[in-house]
Regions:
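Non-catalytic DNA-recognition/assembly elements of restriction-modification systems
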Residues: 1-42, 56-59, 163-164, 170-205, ...
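Alpha-helix initiation and N-capping motif
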Residues: 26, 44, 119, 128, ...
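Sequence-specific dsDNA recognition surfaces
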Residues: 30-80, 100, 104-105, 233, ...
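A short beta-sheet element
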Residues: 80-132, 136-140, 144-152
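Extended hydrophobic-aromatic, low-complexity segments
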Residues: 95, 120-121, 133-135, 162-166, ...
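Active-site lining segments that contact anionic ligands and/or coordinate catalytic metals
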Residues: 105-106, 152-154, 189, 199
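Short, well-ordered beta-strand elements within core beta-sheets of diverse protein domains
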Residues: 109-113, 153-158, 170-177
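C-terminal, helix-dominated tail/subdomain
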Residues: 204, 211-220
Length: 242
């Protein structure tokens, strides 16, 4: 499980680096994206796809399943490829690239790229520490600061990223989504099997380790593919030999 978390951390750093090294004309990100304001009644929220500030994980670790749904009011609608950020205590750096459609708390901001092809690039921009530091400069409140929506949209980034940057951030973000889903499957499997192992209900002596070895070979193949992605992602900036 930790392998996928660590791997995604590296991939996200690559995305950040790509966005940061764009040297074109800078513009406020309000030219690249908008904040979603679409709302629906809370009874339309589904637990599997509902995102709260609590379900978003600190230090840019994506999200986990929400523990409950709101009982009153409205929720914000998000779509696949939107970027969700908790607006409570921005210094916790809670951010997630949506891989599905769903709803979220009003304290979760939904950024949507005006050009869908730039959604991974937008995620790379918003994922940077410098963005969260910028948001904190405009935050209001002491015990529980909230970011200023207008202020954060004035954060600047390159307005017209190169095609290779768009392609690379897209490849990397797609792999991040795949890894997240694989990690979710393994987590669910662990939660089911571990109690059975502890109770002795499952006898490990009867496990077919040839299947396990086959799975490991597939993981090695996936790692080989990723080793090809890295030099593509950072042409001229990164070398696997460094």
């Amino acid at each position: 499980l930790q392998l996928y978390v660590s791997l995604n951390g590296y991939l996200e750093e690559l995305c950040e680096c790509l966005a940061a090294h764009e040297s074109g004309t800078k513009t406020e990100i309000m030219q690249l994206c908008s904040l979603v304001s679409e709302k629906v009644p809370c009874n339309e929220a589904v637990l599997n796809t509902y995102v709260s500030t609590e379900s978003l994980l600190s230090d840019k670790r994506g999200r986990q399943r929400a523990s409950s749904l709101p009982r009153t009011g409205k929720v914000t609608v998000y779509r696949s490829s939107d970027v969700l950020i908790s607006n409570i205590r921005p210094y916790f750096k809670k951010i997630w690239f949506a891989d599905c459609d769903g709803t979220c708390s009003g304290d979760v901001l939904v950024f949507r790229a005006k050009n869908p092809l730039l959604a991974p690039y937008l995620y790379s921009i918003l994922h940077a520490d410098s963005f969260f530091e910028f948001v904190m400069k405009g935050a209001k409140g002491t015990k529980m600061p909230r970011g200023d929506k207008r202020q954060m949209l004035t954060y600047q980034a390159a307005s017209s990223p190169r095609q290779d940057t768009i392609a690379s951030t897209t490849i990397l973000t797609e792999q991040i989504v795949i890894n997240d889903r694989e990690n979710d499957k393994l987590t669910a499997l662990r939660d089911v099997i571990l109690p059975k192992l502890m109770s002795g209900e499952i006898d490990v002596s009867k496990i077919d380790f040839t299947q396990l070895n086959s799975h490991l070979e597939k993981r090695k193949a996936a790692a080989s593919v990723l080793s090809l992605i890295f030099p593509i992602a950072l042409p001229g900036l990164w070398s696997p030999m460094q």
